[in-house]
Swiss-Prot record:
InterPro entries (UniProt xref): ADH-like_C, ADH-like_N, GroES-like_sf, NAD(P)-bd_dom_sf, PKS_ER, Quin_OxRdtase/zeta-crystal_CS, Zinc-ADH_QOR/CCCR
Source superkingdom: Eukaryota
Annotated TM spans: none
Protein name stated in the entry: Quinone oxidoreductase
Organism of this sequence: Rattus norvegicus
EC number(s) reported in the record: 1.6.5.5
N-acetylalanine modification, residue list: A2
Subunit structure: Homotetramer.
Primary gene name: Cryz
Record-listed NADP(+) binding positions: 53, 158-161, 181, 200, 229, 246-249, 269-271
Enzyme class: oxidoreductase
Known function: Does not have alcohol dehydrogenase activity. Binds NADP and acts through a one-electron transfer process. Orthoquinones, such as 1,2-naphthoquinone or 9,10-phenanthrenequinone, are the best substrates (in vitro). May act in the detoxification of xenobiotics. Interacts with (AU)-rich elements (ARE) in the 3'-UTR of target mRNA species and enhances their stability. NADPH binding interferes with mRNA binding.
């Protein structure tokens, strides 16, 4: 290590595996921004389920080892690289796709995936914007092509992506149904845009959804746990209805005939398949929502950086998650 290099704390992964492979190191060199990059002093970083899949080595996208996890950060610009004109040192920002990893005291981000963080939102809320809200936008408008007047069922609506989906869908004129695993979770979902919420732990909750949807069925289902719900989802859809798969933790057997009579679709979502133009569209939706006040990130569990392994354990195994999980730095 060269003399004079600035060091930081960061979580590093040297091998794929369980949460225990997340190692806190205090001698990681602070990266320098290259052309069209910014260096962010991280105040908060979001924790997303996909980061546990990547860490385990079971995800389609495998980073080169060692690496630092994390995509969503909010903080203050520390320095900027050549060609950056939109930001300067001291600016409050959030980003959804770090270059160097977000579980760290400093993170690099491309200037075109970095956005101003309004004073109306704190850093924790800023770290809850990126992946949840951009994923919700892609699921609703790119994958489902949802339209005002349609109905949408959001499974796992009390989590980060679920709440973002409810807020966005309600603001765009959809009838919003949600599921949650507790009375507290149901209340939170109602407060964030849903017209009606069902407890997915109740044995007859599917029947209650059918009653609410009526003979037509549900136009769009945003599915956070396809390996559990997909078969039932297909029975809830309207003619031409769409199941949008945002999350899945295993396999499931379905009957393809359930898609035929009503000509329904199952569509997967991959946020990072979005084009630059699509990301700009999603950012515009968020900006409008922030200005109008309906984008309201809800924060759930908070952990210090050194508890990242516990956060990964909890985000997968804790039932009835509410809000966005955050690492505080």
């Amino acid at each position: 290590m060269a003399t004079g290099q600035k060091l930081m704390r960061a979580i590093r992964v040297f091998e794929f595996g369980g949460p225990e492979v997340l190692k806190l190191q205090s001698d990681v060199v602070v990266p320098a921004p290259q052309s069209h990059q910014v260096l962010i002093k991280v105040h908060a970083c979001g924790v997303n389920p996909v980061e546990t899949y990547i860490r385990s080595g079971t995800y389609s996208r495998k980073p080169a080892l060692p690496y630092t996890p994390g995509s969503d950060v909010a903080g203050i610009i520390e320095s900027v690289g050549d060609g950056v004109s939109a930001f300067k040192k001291g600016d409050r920002v959030f980003c959804f796709s770090t270059v160097s990893g977000g579980y760290a005291e400093f993170a690099l981000s491309a200037d075109n995936t970095t956005y101003p963080l309004p004073e109306t939102l704190d850093f924790r809320q800023g770290a809850a914007l990126g992946i949840p809200y951009f994923t919700a936008c892609r699921a609703l408008f790119h994958s489902a092509r949802a339209r005002a007047g349609e109905s949408v069922l959001v499974h796992g609506a009390s989590g980060g992506v679920g709440l973002a989906t409810c807020q966005i869908a309600r603001a765009h004129g959809l009838k919003v149904l949600g599921t949650a695993g507790s009375e507290e979770g149901k209340k939170l979902v109602l407060q964030n845009g849903a017209h009606e919420v069902f407890n997915h732990k109740e044995a007859n909750y599917i029947d209650k959804i059918k009653t609410s949807a009526g003979d037509k069925g549900v136009d769009v289902i945003i599915e956070m746990l396809a390996n559990k719900n997909l078969s039932n989802d297909l029975k809830l859809l309207s003619c031409g209805g769409r199941v949008i798969v945002v999350g899945c933790r295993g396999s499931i057997e379905i009957n393809p005939r359930d898609t035929m009579a009503k000509e329904t679709s199952i569509i997967g979502v991959s946020l990072f398949s979005s084009t630059k133009e699509e990301f700009q569209q999603f950012a515009g939706i968020l900006q409008a929502g922030i200005e109008k006040g309906w984008v309201k990130p809800v924060i759930g569990s908070e952990y210090p950086l050194e508890k990242a392994a516990q956060a990964h354990e909890d985000i997968i195994h804790s039932s009835g998650k509410m809000g966005k999980m955050i690492l505080l730095l």
